A protein has these predicted regions:
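Short, well-ordered coil/turn segments that N-cap beta-strands
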Residues: 6-8, 40-46, 108-113, 208-212, ...
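Hydrophobic targeting/anchoring helices
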Residues: 77, 214-321
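Aromatic-lined substrate-binding rim segments of carbohydrate-active enzymes
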Residues: 2-76, 100-103, 107, 197-208, ...
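Short aromatic-enriched loop/helix-cap "lid" or pocket-rim segments at secondary-structure transitions
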Residues: 58-61, 125-130, 319-321
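Polysaccharide-binding and catalytic clefts of secreted carbohydrate-active enzymes
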Residues: 72, 76-235, 239-256
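Short, solvent-exposed turn/loop segments enriched in Gly/Ser/Thr/Pro and often Arg
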Residues: 11-16, 49-58, 113-122, 217-222, ...
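Glycine-rich anion/phosphate-binding loops
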Residues: 25-31, 89-97, 254, 286-291
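Conserved, mostly hydrophobic/aromatic
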Residues: 2, 10, 39, 102, ...
């Protein structure tokens, strides 16, 4: 089927942690290796993903600190995808161990050509661990609390801080009007995310693989400063689901072209399209079947070197990739 569809590269393992490690410390990589072997025999290359985008239930139950805390300081339940704390030492260690093992077992496979780090990084955590890292980040940036107060204009509304320990991240239950606080928090979230990516890449290198790495960025996402990703990614990739065949097509064309240009400009080099859909998706009210070749023309004329579809297999399949 893949050959008939002219598919020469696939991404695997993206949301597969619960299958790769069904119980703590008990790993099952055989099925993944078999898939990569079979693809390679058919002349199809593999982009191997790290599974940190969705953690298994046993981890959330045993180590609740891996779950995010919302702005109102309540801990989330298990579920969803981006529901993990980028600061949690437990989560970072678990991710490190998994990534290193994948690198050791599969990083030198001749069919593997690229590492896909996690999936669609985004969101933020307001737990005590992240709060403390935020205070350390502020202290490193400003040096003294006096300089922070001056830069943030905290005299307004009598919001002067006496020490960095008094500072809390923005919250609907507390400080949520101080623009400088919100801006620095967003900058901190980007730096925290990048630091997490660096940890994943380091684990892969420890496992022996020197293959390039990418991370699939998201359309028009303003929660992270993508320009800062240029130093941690070898190649930029992103996910694009344009809604073609509306009344005014040129808006969609212009928007898609602009997004392609933004992704290409992050590293000033060709990019990859990691996700797209030729027909309908289950999260858009309207997403018509595209005319043959139209996305291909838009994509490659803007500098892409890869077009991948998501998702080709049912989520009930092993690994859910």
């Amino acid at each position: 089927m893949f050959q008939k569809a002219h598919i020469n590269t696939v991404s695997v393992g993206i949301f597969s942690w619960a299958v790769l490690e069904p119980e703590e410390g008990k790993y099952n990589l055989g099925w993944l290796e078999e898939i990569i072997d079979n693809l390679y025999k058919e002349g199809i290359s593999t982009i191997l993903a790290t599974p940190s985008g969705a953690r298994p239930k046993w981890m959330a139950d045993k180590y609740p600190e891996v779950l995010r805390m919302d702005p109102d300081r309540t801990r989330r339940f298990f579920g969803g995808r981006h529901n993990h704390c980028y600061t949690s030492p437990v989560y970072r260690q678990k991710v490190h161990d998994m990534d290193k093992l994948l690198s050791q077992r599969l990083g030198s496979h001749p069919g593997v050509i690229l590492w896909h780090i996690s999936n669609e990084f985004g969101g933020e955590c307001y737990c005590p661990l992240c709060q403390q890292k935020f205070r350390e980040w502020l202290k490193e940036k400003y040096g003294t609390i006096e300089k922070l107060n001056s830069s943030w204009c905290t005299t307004f509304w009598s919001h002067i801080y006496n020490s960095f320990d008094q500072i809390e991240a923005p919250s609907p239950k507390g400080e949520n009007e101080l623009h400088a606080l919100k801006l620095d928090w967003n900058r901190f979230v980007t730096d925290r995310t990048i630091d997490f990516i660096k940890g994943e890449v380091a684990a892969i290198r420890e496992g022996g693989s020197e293959l390039p790495v990418t991370a699939n960025l998201m359309y028009d996402y303003n929660g992270l400063d993508y320009k800062k990703f240029r130093d941690v990614l070898d190649v930029v990739s992103w996910d694009n689901y344009p809604s073609w065949h509306k009344k005014e097509e040129f808006f969609t064309a212009i928007d898609a072209g602009m997004q392609h240009d933004l992704m290409r400009s992050i590293k000033n080099q060709p990019f990859l399209l990691m996700e797209s859909c030729p027909s309908a998706t289950n999260w858009k009210p309207i997403n018509k079947l595209k005319k043959p070749g139209m996305m291909l023309v838009s994509l490659f004329s803007s500098g892409s070197r890869l077009r991948q579809r998501f998702i080709l297999s049912a989520a009930s399949e092993p690994g859910g990739f």
